[in-house]
UniProtKB/Swiss-Prot annotation:
Source organism (scientific name): Mus musculus (Mouse)
Domain LRRCT per the UniProt entry, residue ranges: 137-175
Any one Pfam family match given in the protein's UniProt record, by short name: LRR_9
Keywords tagged on the record: Cytoplasm, Leucine-rich repeat, Repeat
Protein's name according to its UniProt entry: Leucine-rich repeat-containing protein 51
Major site of localization recorded for this protein: cytoplasm
Amino acid sequence: MSSRDYMNTSVQEPPLDYSFKSVQMVQDLVTEEPRTGLRPVRHSKSGKSLTQSLWLNNNVLNDLKDFNQVVSQLLQHPENLAWIDLSFNDLTTIDPVLTTFFNLSVLYLHGNGIHRLGEVNKLAVLPRLRSLTLHGNPIEEEKGYRQYVLCNLPRITTFDFSGVTRADRSTAEVWKRMGIKPKKVRAKQDVL
């Protein structure tokens, strides 16, 4: 199968779905059976999946150690990985390994424990990233969260499942020109 044929067919392939498997370590994926959907994932002659989507949501992953190696074992063309769903895990940072997938266009990280807004900056190197979710992380509580993300990731067209509007772009551009930094929202203290 030519590279062009692969790109055309794999986009339509169902995801390799390891969601709701209580996976604790990325290495466990090698021995874990993926969930089956209405359409089965096709495999190459070597047994690797012919898909560009990997769903790891609703597990208990707290790091992505050995992610590249495991993805290479699972996918025939890991370099073409376009969609990664890591939502509802226990991640506290955006692992730099995610920035090695230059064809990544959809990345779901909502419902984790990411607490430093600066983590978002790592994703700026992904030229095709268009859809990103981060809601449900502690960073969402920072004032200016949306503007900060859109300022640093100007190619995003969908953020937290909402389309990016012209007004969003305009506000993000103002933030960028003015060098505005987001502020942590402080919990109100009861005054006696």
